[in-house]
């Protein structure tokens, strides 16, 4: 059985691509049709490719791989943080700092500083310092926490990176490529799939679509590490059953193509 049904994908709006004037021709093979000026992603292919991504992630997790979830756009921030933590992994959900991977030694120094400030707060040092100095330290802590909190405990450069919106996260992807880190990504109709190792054709703007796919990648990590019985899957309204054909899905899109297309 597929790890996600077409019905689940449909109800989360995974099939909605971008407007036809905003597309990357390399995504043509993943597009089923066009309706009302919007490309419709072929969910039959997405079902298969989610399965492939799930198996890849599960195998890497079984081999004790370290995973970094990356998604800095507003629609992805919560899902990226929550699902990576649920899987016991790491995340970047605000601005990607250049060199996060390729200059890991420098990033580790910033992380060390973050931990030092936290320790000062916890051991009572702040109580003995002037208020002005404490305010500056807290401001520094807040900034470091925002950008590095999700990788504070990451033991090494990740073995796999999961990305929402490769166009927005192109710097992160370039760093991963330079270090031969495989990238699993949700790829919308305006992105270049050639940059991605494991492609999931998907709407990467709708919150529900992002949550659905991201949660499933977290499930794969948990299953790979602990076994299928320990996977606590996220709950979605969609029933886990085989979906309708792509033709029926396209019919459903008629008159409803403004749903789940945030920021398209």
From Swiss-Prot:
<dbReference type="GO" id="GO:0022627">
    <property type="term" value="C:cytosolic small ribosomal subunit"/>
</dbReference>
<dbReference type="InterPro" id="IPR018130">
    <property type="entry name" value="Ribosomal_uS2_CS"/>
</dbReference>
<dbReference type="GO" id="GO:0006412">
    <property type="term" value="P:translation"/>
</dbReference>
<dbReference type="InterPro" id="IPR001865">
    <property type="entry name" value="Ribosomal_uS2"/>
</dbReference>
<protein>
    <recommendedName>
        <fullName>Small ribosomal subunit protein uS2</fullName>
    </recommendedName>
</protein>
<keyword id="KW-0687">Ribonucleoprotein</keyword>
<dbReference type="GO" id="GO:0003735">
    <property type="term" value="F:structural constituent of ribosome"/>
</dbReference>
<comment type="similarity">
    <text>Belongs to the universal ribosomal protein uS2 family.</text>
</comment>
<keyword id="KW-0689">Ribosomal protein</keyword>
<dbReference type="InterPro" id="IPR005706">
    <property type="entry name" value="Ribosomal_uS2_bac/mit/plastid"/>
</dbReference>
<dbReference type="InterPro" id="IPR023591">
    <property type="entry name" value="Ribosomal_uS2_flav_dom_sf"/>
</dbReference>
<dbReference type="Pfam" id="PF00318">
    <property type="entry name" value="Ribosomal_S2"/>
</dbReference>
């Amino acid at each position: 059985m597929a790890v996600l049904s077409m019905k689940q994908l449909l109800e989360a709006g995974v099939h909605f691509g971008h407007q036809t004037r905003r597309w990357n021709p390399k995504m043509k093979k993943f597009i089923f049709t066009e309706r009302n000026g919007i490309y419709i992603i072929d969910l039959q292919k997405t079902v298969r490719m989610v399965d492939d991504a799930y198996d890849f992630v599960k195998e890497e997790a079984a081999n004790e791989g370290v995973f970094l979830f990356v998604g800095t756009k507003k629609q992805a921030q919560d899902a990226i943080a929550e699902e990576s933590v649920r899987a016991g992994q790491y995340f970047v959900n605000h601005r990607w700092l250049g060199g996060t991977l390729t200059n890991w030694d420098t990033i580790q120094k910033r992380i060390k500083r973050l931990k030092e400030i936290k320790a000062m707060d916890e051991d009572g040092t702040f109580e003995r310092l002037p208020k002005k100095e404490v305010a500056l330290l807290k401001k520094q802590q807040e900034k470091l926490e925002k950008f590095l909190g999700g990788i504070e405990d990451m033991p090494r450069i990740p073995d796999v990176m999961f990305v929402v919106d490769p166009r927005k996260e192109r710097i992160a992807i370039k760093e991963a490529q330079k270090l031969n880190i495989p990238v699993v990504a949700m790829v919308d109709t305006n992105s270049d799939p050639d940059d991605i190792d494991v492609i999931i054709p998907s709407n990467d703007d709708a919150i529900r679509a992002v949550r659905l796919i991201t949660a499933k990648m977290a499930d794969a990590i948990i299953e790979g590490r602990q076994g299928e019985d320990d996977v606590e899957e996220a709950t979605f309204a969609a029933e886990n059953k085989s979906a309708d054909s792509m033709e029926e899905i396209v019919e459903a899109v008629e008159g409803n193509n403004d749903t789940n297309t945030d920021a398209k």
